[in-house]
Amino acid sequence: MQFEKTPGWLDWYAGPSKPQFVLPAGAVDAHCHVFGPGAQFPYAPERKYTPCDASKEQLFALRDHLGFEKNVIVQATCHGADNRALVDALSRSEGRARGVATVKRSISDAEIQSMHDAGVRGVRFNFVKRLVDFTPKDELLEIASRIKA
């Protein structure tokens, strides 16, 4: 499947500079994303933007280059509630990543457990209008009540 990148979206930059300081042991990049690749993990039809592909391999290489030990991978809004790219990245992270998923009220308890088993430890509620459509408060509260510690 071919996706045309939203105008103004920057391409992946393969040559980032390394920080001049050394991160402390155990440093975590606490908010990062994987985008696609769209051919394998299609972007959601309801998305508000289409990014360039930024794979798990690119993310992990960047993490290591910058000196982080771990990542928290947050579900990108362009993937909607299809968390396959996130779960795939977590499964290939060698235990060095945890995830934050986006879910709908129709998610089953088995799906919640499966994501937990993959390393998902949180659910994202996004209120940024330029990124997502409105979600009714009762739906958010229903989802929140189903998330177990």
Please describe what each predicted stretch is:
Residues M1-A81:
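An N-terminally biased module of ancient metal coordination in phosphate/nucleic-acid-related enzymes
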Residues Q2-D11, H79-A149:
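Active-site gating/metal-coordination segments in enzymes
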